[in-house]
Amino acid sequence: MTGVQQAYRGRIRLEVAGRDYLSPSNVFERSRDMAYACKAIDSPVGELKLVASDTGLAAILWQDDDPGRVRLGPLFEDPDNAVLVETERQLCAYFAGELTRFDLPLDFQGTEFQKSVWAALLTIPFGETRSYGEIARQIGHPTAFRAVGAANGRNPISIVAPCHRVVGSTGALTGFAGGLATKERLLGLERAHSTL
């Protein structure tokens, strides 16, 4: 096999016949090969499934989540997993209005573009919102607001990486994996406690 190796944002990309081997399918194939610890918890917005890899929190899934939204490997119950226990503690404090910023190890699995969007979500302050266009400009792709919306919709770590804080250009609430009523509830909770 012949190919050209190039530096690619700190990683090696192997190009063979024009194919980028860091394509989404290859990224997700790697994540499907791993087993993930999980724990279900009750919350004010319904049951949440917390999922951790061996390096950090990998997902927070909604009770009625679309199974194809977040691609993960096999899950096994581990209610004593340290990352999951700490995530539950911080989520409880968040819902009680006692926590405005999470401090957890995160393990985002996605494309480089998706990870740049998800990293931008982490910069949105508690109680504030940003538009898809603002996020697109922040990550250096000012015309990619639709792609930002798609990446936002695939955010695997809801609430902690606050995709609920992203709204339409007019300020209207737009799609959310947990449902628009949940998005409105999370934003309302944050507005009520934004002076913390």
Mark where each language-model region is.
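N-terminal amphipathic/basic-hydrophobic helices that include classical n-h-c signal peptides
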Residues: 1-33, 174
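Basic nucleic-acid-binding alpha-helical/helix-turn surface characteristic of O6-alkylguanine DNA
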Residues: 21-142, 189-196
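Regulatory, non-catalytic segments
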Residues: 146-155
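Major-groove DNA-recognition helix of helix-turn-helix-type DNA-binding domains
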Residues: 156, 160
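Short cysteine clusters
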Residues: 163
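…primarily DNA-binding HTH/wHTH and HhH modules…
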Residues: 169-196
